[in-house]
């Protein structure tokens, strides 16, 4: 299998180090495809290697990195495309491990653990509070601290901070199936491509060892942090539920809609007192599913119809009980900060953003021992579902909670 390592560069300062890490590969059937977009010269030692192909292609000044990488990949001849930034390093067994893993698993996308290193030799070690695990790693006589990547589950795939990091490799078939890099993206292009790769049904495999060392520079992120945050939020908002639904399908987990007699989305089983897929009294008899057997519980315009106090606590405990580890509660409830919570005479419990603290924060839960559920608050926000709701000041609180049942979760865990 020919492996195409692709590298766009506007600054070849560290290319010699990159080249040395390629020369040291235990797997020898590779090509290095460099897309050169700078006046600075690439060292002759690199250009002189027959396995290196350099393309000097004028790129429009306003072209995004997505367009540049898509062009770079189009120039590759191999069956496996490996992303390699122009200032980073590969471990000697990187390409061999990728090829071996692809042949053994049939993966279309692979990623590994990684090291973030600085010029002074120190490492950027991510905070364990956000779910990160680290371990010691030695490379070329130097000691580093490696970061363990997260599994490809909805909690990690929906945030750039936890999504698959380097090394990242696509089979050419998987890359094309996903549509390649988005040419309109000037940043966050890799995250957006990873999400689309997953949604294309490509098999993901995490390789739990370090194959890549990422060089961090001063202000690597700080100058772009706001842009990154905003763009990743756009990607998340667009794809989050598609990712969750596909994860359920892959794991044969049903999706249920509580109080779903009306408005039940395709793919969900509705549960309600009557005229539903499952006719059942949820408040009286609980949720008619076994423990840890459900992928998503949808509760749109439902929680406010559960009596306050013990019944609401029991319902949240029930939702947690039936959710599989990593399963999602997707909820939408009229907020007390608008008129909707109180205007309907059938509403008998009242909710706002703070209400979900008791099910996702130890600080509040400790005062209500009857609450047994342990949720991670993935997203909680307030908005108007439609202009009509806005006109009539009917504000809703949305809460996406993830069932924490001992599995490794990305993001803060307060409970």
What residue ranges belong to the model's regions?
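N-proximal low-complexity "stem/linker" segments adjacent to membrane-targeting elements
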Residues: 1-21
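Glycine-rich, basic loop-to-helix element that forms the pyrophosphate-binding segment
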Residues: 59-76
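Short, acidic, metal-binding catalytic loop of nucleotide-sugar glycosyltransferases
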Residues: 20-29
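Short aromatic/hydrophobic "clamp" motif used to bind/position activated sugar donors
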Residues: 81
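Conserved donor NDP-sugar-binding/catalytic core segment of glycosyltransferases
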Residues: 95-137
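Catalytic beta-strand/loop signature of glycosyltransferases that borders the donor
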Residues: 113, 204-211
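Acidic donor-binding loop at a coil-to-helix junction in glycosyltransferase catalytic cores
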Residues: 187-193
């Amino acid at each position: 299998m020919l492996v195409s390592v692709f590298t766009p560069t506007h600054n070849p300062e560290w290319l010699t180090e990159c080249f040395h890490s390629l020369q040291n590969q235990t797997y020898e059937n590779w090509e290095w495809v460099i897309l050169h977009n700078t006046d600075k010269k690439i060292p002759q030692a690199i250009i002189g290697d027959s396995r290196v192909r350099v393309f000097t292609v004028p790129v429009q000044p306003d072209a995004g990195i997505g367009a540049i990488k898509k062009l770079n990949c189009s120039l590759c001849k191999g069956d496996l495309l490996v992303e390699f930034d122009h200032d980073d390093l590969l471990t000697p067994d990187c390409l061999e491990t990728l090829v071996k893993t692809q042949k053994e698993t049939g993966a279309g996308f692979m990623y590994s653990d990684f090291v973030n290193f600085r010029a002074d030799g120190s490492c950027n070690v991510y905070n364990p509070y956000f779910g990160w695990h680290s371990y010691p790693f030695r490379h070329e006589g130097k000691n580093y601290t490696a970061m363990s990547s997260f599994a490809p589950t909805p909690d990690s795939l929906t945030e750039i901070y936890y999504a698959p990091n380097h090394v990242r490799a696509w089979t050419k078939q998987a890359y094309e199936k996903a549509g390649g890099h988005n040419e309109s993206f000037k940043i966050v292009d890799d995250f957006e491509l990873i999400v689309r790769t997953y949604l294309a049904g490509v098999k993901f495999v995490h390789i739990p060892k370090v194959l890549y060392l990422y060089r961090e520079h001063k202000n690597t992120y700080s100058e772009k942090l706001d842009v990154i945050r905003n763009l990743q939020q756009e990607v998340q908002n667009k794809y989050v539920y598609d990712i969750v639904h596909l994860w359920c399908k892959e794991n044969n987990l049903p999706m249920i809609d509580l109080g779903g007699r009306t408005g039940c989305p395709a793919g969900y089983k509705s549960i309600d007192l009557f005229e539903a897929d499952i006719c059942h009294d949820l408040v009286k008899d609980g949720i008619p599913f076994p423990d840890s057997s459900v992928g998503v519980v949808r509760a749109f315009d439902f929680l406010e119809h559960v009596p306050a106090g013990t019944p609401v606590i029991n319902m949240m405990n029930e939702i947690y009980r039936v959710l599989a580890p990593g399963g999602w509660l997707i909820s939408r409830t009229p907020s007390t900060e608008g008129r909707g919570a109180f205007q309907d005479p059938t509403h008998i419990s009242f909710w706002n953003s703070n209400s979900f603290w008791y099910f996702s924060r130890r600080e509040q839960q400790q005062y209500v021992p009857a609450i047994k559920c342990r949720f991670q608050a993935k997203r909680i926000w307030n908005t108007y579902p439609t202009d009509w709701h806005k006109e009539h000041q009917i504000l809703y609180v949305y809460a996406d909670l993830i069932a924490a049942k001992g599995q490794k979760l990305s993001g803060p865990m307060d409970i």
